[in-house]
From Swiss-Prot:
GO cellular component, one term: cytosol
Annotated positions of the Phosphoserine modification: 302
GO molecular function terms attached to this record: actin binding; metallocarboxypeptidase activity; microtubule binding; tubulin-tyrosine carboxypeptidase
Induction, as annotated: By VEGF.
Quaternary structure and interacting proteins, as annotated: Interacts with SVBP; interaction enhances VASH2 tyrosine carboxypeptidase activity.
Species annotation: Homo sapiens (Human)
The encoding gene: VASH2
Upper taxonomic lineage: Eukaryota, Metazoa, Chordata, Craniata, Vertebrata
The reaction(s) this protein catalyses: C-terminal L-alpha-aminoacyl-L-glutamyl-L-glutamyl-L-tyrosyl-[tubulin] + H2O = C-terminal L-alpha-aminoacyl-L-glutamyl-L-glutamyl-[tubulin] + L-tyrosine
Effect in UniProt of substituting residue 215 to A: Slightly reduced tyrosine carboxypeptidase activity
Protein name in UniProt: Tubulinyl-Tyr carboxypeptidase 2
GO biological process: axon development; cell-cell fusion; labyrinthine layer blood vessel development; positive regulation of angiogenesis; positive regulation of endothelial cell proliferation; proteolysis; regulation of angiogenesis; syncytium formation by plasma membrane fusion
Amino acid sequence: MTGSAADTHRCPHPKGAKGTRSRSSHARPVSLATSGGSEEEDKDGGVLFHVNKSGFPIDSHTWERMWMHVAKVHPKGGEMVGAIRNAAFLAKPSIPQVPNYRLSMTIPDWLQAIQNYMKTLQYNHTGTQFFEIRKMRPLSGLMETAKEMTRESLPIKCLEAVILGIYLTNGQPSIERFPISFKTYFSGNYFHHVVLGIYCNGRYGSLGMSRRAELMDKPLTFRTLSDLIFDFEDSYKKYLHTVKKVKIGLYVPHEPHSFQPIEWKQLVLNVSKMLRADIRKELEKYARDMRMKILKPASAHSPTQVRSRGKSLSPRRRQASPPRRLGRREKSPALPEKKVADLSTLNEVGYQIRI
């Protein structure tokens, strides 16, 4: 969820302050508008936030805009900003080590290591999202952004955490990942949040980042998808938030070079207008469908199976004359012999060779 409190202890260096910073491969000119253009809401809970579109190193416009926003929303305002920016010495922030999977680790331990890494990066309270996430971008491009997150080691928000979680869990086929989005209502405003749902060995859990510990990672202990969603809903109630909508996407493929975008909202539930029994029914049906899709893709699109049924993959051959047209020419005495001869020209998959 987006927040308005400022955390000024983990701020990036401005352009030119650190020569080793990498330039983003998808950098674009900065817009002067407050809207960042990211797929994540630019105004969440009535609070505007900005998106860094200049890549790294951060340009002067984005840098100054961030500090102006912090000065407006922080309780000590400009005094605090001036104390930091005019300080003669600032401690160098530590760069956490990216977790590495070891064969001795269990899946829950590996997921916990990933979540601990995200927590070390910290949640971004500056009001400026450092990494632009365009939801319709191909998965390969989003994985490049995730690599950039590990290089820059800056605080992240919920949407960035989902992309980073996908990147760090790649190569573990037993772990299925899918996005879960929430739209909630509190004190006259709507809020948006997203986490990365996890399914492994018949259990559900999640990875993510939030200002609230109960609204990010969940242990891999939930037997059903509905149990996981209801646990999030109960956590929201602790903060007097009413969950209005829940959106669930499809499993994200374990192919970092895929040009396929992430499916963010395959299932949309207006949970505020539904009974829990109906919500559970819809969620469990959807969960079964997702699990079946894991088992079916290889067979559902297999050319071998389609051909074994005598069906052609070619549209032209599928339009061949039906047997009924042969019946119209039964007057010709040579037709039956010709038909037998034609059968010898069929290959093993039922295609007729025409000369």
